């Protein structure tokens, strides 16, 4: 059984715990952290499918900067901003950086779950395209493999 992994990043501890518990209740593997820095550390250790990310987090890096760094660590992770402070500027900047969507807090699970399902599908589609592309760039020759992407021979 495939377990989808969701990381919730929010400085409001009560909100964070509530969302994580509700996601786990629905069979998702959910993790919660209170800062952008903690999220980046977790992403270095654990593969995540979707990140629910607050934009305004005091005392450290904000959601926009966290998103910039997320895309360097796990470029295929889908990011949905969950925020009470969405502005047109932050929405545009987030979308340019690769955010999948924005939801305004308080968010209802009836609204969040379809967005998560769509984000999982999108991530899976991206992964399948990459796998397909990598397979298509390999040519098998007796005794060796030639990788068209790197233009070099690889031993079996």
Sequence positions of predicted segments:
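Short amphipathic alpha-helix used as the core "switch/output" element in two-component signaling
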Residues: 41, 61-75
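Conserved acidic segment of CheY-like receiver
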Residues: 3-14, 19-23, 51
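CheY-like receiver
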Residues: 122-156
